[in-house]
Amino acid sequence: MKVAVIGCGTIANAAHIPSYMNNPEAEIKYFCDIIPERAQAAVEKYGCGTAVVDYHDVLADPEVEAVSVCTPNNVHPTISIDALRAGKNVLCEKPAARTYKEALEMQKVQHETGKVLNIGVVNRFNDSVNLIKKYIDDGKLGNIYHVHASFRAHRSIPGLGGAFTTKAIAGGGALIDWGVHYLDIVMYCCGDPKVKTVTGEAFCELGKDMKGYAYTDMWAGSPKYDGTYDVDDSVVGMIRTEGPVISLHGAWAQNIGENECYIDFMGDKGGIRLQYGKDFTVYSSEYGALTEYKPVFKMRDHFQNEIDAFIDCIKTGKKLPSHIDTVIITAQMMQAIYDSSEQHKEITLG
């Protein structure tokens, strides 16, 4: 199956491209990027494909069956919609879009075209996350009444002044960049419960004085002090569902010293703490004694799992848990948190 990668930045090189290269049924025909040197560098690094600048050239090729959209958030909807209408199957990196309205338009076009539109919520292909989901589905934790997600860093604002910190491009900050993963894990593991109300507050504090922002390292590029910083660097929220209450506390940067990145699933029979990107611990009691253990199992690369499943679903027609229909609720929740923060009130979802 001939595929193309649109956007040849960090996530493309770290995840999408190597995973396609490792899939025997995939052949990368195009590397596309608006910066010609990036596309050409990919051709030279991986020894295959053709470098192009305009993604419309990719979509015009009838041999291309699937594309990965790995661009900045602001063009996720446009490129994905154009690709769907050109008859291509799409894996669009997270977040699907900057706003819930944009995500709805993507979903609408997917329904019209019938082509695949999956979103890069890669943790749905994480073996650790899927084992937690099985614990919950099998009733091992009993009634899950509360889930808390913490995605807090001491100093981790990406590319200060660049695309990540410009609302017109990214759509938001810590919530839309990191929170999307945590909220998606919670919803997935808990069976995608219906959301009733959302309350939240987003803060832009540590990065607003860009030249005064102290840090030890900065991913996504060096600071651009003549750039823009108008997104949230921290966020808090509470989401009431027909299942558990979900609370969240996230930050690219806070004065906390140590990073705190985990999810606590709290049930009346047991609990689980997932250390993000790592293993998890199960807490319970048995025969009057408290128990605590870490399951031991083989962890496969979740990005490889994601790409393999994407290729397979195109061939078989199987609908994946990362399909736009399933994950669009995350876009709605994030939008509601931002709306709640701006309006200073609780948001009710229909």
Regions found by a protein language model. Name each.
Residues 12, 92, 117-119, 248, ...:
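Hydrophobic residues in well-ordered beta-strands that form the structural core
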Residues 184-279, 307-318:
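Contiguous beta-strand/loop segments that form the cofactor/metal-binding neighborhood of enzyme cores
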Residues 26, 66-68, 104, 112-115, ...:
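C-terminal helix-rich "cap/oligomerization" subdomain common to oxidoreductases
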Residues 1-46:
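N-terminal Rossmann-like dinucleotide-binding module
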Residues 48-55:
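Conserved SAM-binding strand-loop segment of SAM-dependent methyltransferases
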Residues 11, 274, 296-308:
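Active-site loop of classical SDR/Rossmann-like NAD(P)-dependent oxidoreductases
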Residues 11, 123-228, 344:
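Predominantly a Rossmann-like dinucleotide-binding segment in NAD(P)-dependent oxidoreductases
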Residues 66, 72-73, 77-124, 139:
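Beta-strand-loop-alpha-helix segment that lines the small-molecule cofactor/substrate pocket
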